[in-house]
Amino acid sequence: MAISAGASALGLVSSMPSGPGVIDDRLIAEIAASVPPPIATFLLTARVDAEAIAEQHAGCRTSTLQLVDFVAPPQLVRLRRLLPSVELVQVIHVADEDSLEEARLAAPLVDALLLDSGNPNLPVKELGGTGRTHDWRISRRIRDEAGVRVFLAGGINAANVGEAIAAVQPFGIDLCSSVREAGRLSAARLEAFMRSVHAAPKL
């Protein structure tokens, strides 16, 4: 459904402490194997140890790893050595000025950053799918400084995607909750979102 609506990548959500859309790793592997290039497949993982991430990826075989919790720089270096041909995308949960420093630490070690609105500091971590926006002014600063591709996520929907693109000028948009209805992807919401994207300033 997402591909036919015009998506250029699929995010496949593995086990998470919270949030929507979780599917089994075996199903992730099946989907990843069936998606034709140039559509990218993203494995969303909450693991933070390089060996554990690489082990999970070996069973899923996506083109890209989306690291939804902050992975320490030494682990990113190790992960790059373990998976040199897999794209690494580090999620930065934009809360305050500290997010800028996290982005500066991660950017030289990954292929892209993804700016989201979770809260990893809660007793039950929020690592995505919150439906909340964040301070796009901080996101724009990260985008301007990063030196790598920057994706924008967090509460983006058909009504605000044009404003989000204008404010941050990201490489791409990541979305989840705004195109779901009763926990499942909604064709109508996807179509409305894509119409808004096409009407917005070009990414």
Residue ranges of predicted features:
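Conserved N-terminal beta1-alpha1 strand-loop-helix module at the mouth
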Residues: 1-172, 177-203
